[in-house]
Regions:
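Donor nucleotide-sugar binding/catalytic pocket of nucleotide-sugar-dependent glycosyltransferases
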Residues: 36, 51, 128-180
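A short, well-ordered alpha-helix in the C-terminal region of glycosyltransferases
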Residues: 319, 326, 333-348, 357-360
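Conserved acidic donor-binding segment of nucleotide-sugar-dependent glycosyltransferases
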Residues: 305-306, 310-317, 326-332
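Nucleotide-activated donor-binding/catalytic signature segment of Leloir-type glycosyltransferases, i.e.
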Residues: 230-255
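Nucleotide-sugar-dependent
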Residues: 11-15, 201, 251-256, 261-285, ...
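Glycosyltransferase donor-sugar binding loop
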Residues: 39-40, 217-231, 246-247
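Membrane-proximal helix-turn-helix segments that form the acceptor-binding/catalytic region
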Residues: 23, 69-76, 96-100, 106, ...
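Conserved donor-binding/catalytic core segment of Leloir-type glycosyltransferases
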Residues: 4, 149, 183-211, 218-219
Length: 367
């Protein structure tokens, strides 16, 4: 059975697409290819054949036209049995492949209509119109696909209303990847923020929160998406308490988490954040770190239900800083919260469980 995963927007070694899904399918005997658009060339890695259609050029419009056309051409050459799409802009490709008699899965990583409502570069009327338009487009296109995968149960439930063959495959961590046995007493008075750095993810409030801590450093790993925002936060007095690490590979992230005492996920209350399940939340838990997260109902259920951290108002830097300081000053309690988080990952929030859902879906489509 020949499988082709398609992305026009994600990096070739994307954690969900390549490290988890492609690797799991290849491990279980599928002939797996991955089409990407990064200009880094073709290769075979972990028994997955990676085909590069060339780097993305221009802005969003160029990516959604020229790059998508190149992805379609590469997909047709592969002549796969099942095509697995990872970007909304690839939906037209899926419809064309369906007309050719191919089986198509659309993987909804995000609730895009809600995500559009949180775009800072769009004015409110434009957000509302685009969000409603894409909702109508989803309702028209997605019932035509053989299956839909939602990255969360919330996204699954949304698509179940229009496509009965919808499952959730959560982006939970690989059990062994971030596990560490470092002695808590040897950890530094440092906390970690790992991931994309943006206003909507609360970076301004996190930096200002360091003003309310004493003897604590912030390990900041990731890239700024906006130069003006980067300049703004770097001009804050609190920036003196930041270890700027830039983009890190998975092993480097593991090393940072091993020496940190907490992980921060304090996204601002944008429409697509409220019901989201940030990967980093579960990765921090997998690494045995207590977490400081936004106090959204779903996040509160996860954090407080598993006694693995604190939920705070993400708009209140003082509250974020107080939670960080408490964790640093109460090592026994912090270590216990970290163990609780790790235990919950071992029991329910891990890729082994999600892998079985993925394999069952593919087994059904292969029959």
């Amino acid at each position: 059975m020949k499988i082709a995963h398609l992305t026009s927007a994600h990096p070739r070694y994307d954690t969900r697409i390549f490290i988890k899904m492609c690797h799991s399918l290849a491990k279980h005997g599928y002939d797996v290819s991955l089409i990407v658009a990064d200009g880094l060339g073709n290769e075979i890695k972990n028994n997955v054949a990676i085909f590069d259609v060339g780097a993305k050029t221009g802005g969003r419009l160029s990516r959604m036209t020229k790059t998508v056309k190149r992805v379609l051409d590469a997909a047709l050459k592969l002549n796969a049995d099942i095509y697995h799409l990872h970007d909304p802009e690839l939906i037209p490709i899926g419809l064309k492949l369906k007309k050719l008699g191919k089986k198509v899965i659309f993987d909804a990583h995000e609730d895009l209509p809600k995500q559009i409502l949180g775009k800072p570069y769009l004015n409110k009327p434009t957000k509302v119109v685009l969000s409603k338009a894409f909702t109508l487009y989803e309702h028209w296109a997605c019932p035509k696909f053989d299956a839909i995968i939602g990255a969360t149960a919330f996204i699954r439930d949304k698509f179940l209303k229009i496509n009965a063959n919808t499952v959730d495959v959560n982006n939970f961590p690989l059990l062994d990847e971030l596990a560490n046995t470092s002695d808590w007493s040897k950890k530094l008075n440092e906390v970690a923020y790992v991931g994309d750095i943006s206003k909507i993810r609360g970076i301004e409030e996190v930096i200002l929160a360091m003003n309310y801590t004493h003897g604590v450093k912030l390990n900041l790993a990731g890239k700024f998406g906006d130069k003006a925002l980067e300049n703004k936060v770097k001009n804050q007095q609190a920036w003196l308490k930041v270890n700027e690490l830039g983009f890190l590979n998975r092993q480097q992230v593991n090393e940072v988490l091993a020496k940190s005492k907490a992980g921060l996920v304090t996204f601002l209350p944008a429409p697509n954040h409220i019901d989201a399940q940030p990967n980093k939340m579960f990765e921090y838990m997998s690494a045995g770190l207590p977490i400081v997260t936004s106090n959204f109902p779903l996040w509160r259920e996860i954090v407080e239900g598993n006694q693995c951290g604190f939920c705070v108002n993400p708009l209140n830097s003082n509250e974020i800083g107080d939670a960080i300081q408490y964790i640093v000053e109460h090592p026994q309690e912090a270590e216990e919260m970290g163990k609780n988080g790790r235990k919950s990952v071992e029991e329910k929030y891990n890729w082994l469980i999600e892998e079985q859902k993925l394999l069952m879906l593919y087994k059904g489509l292969s029959a």
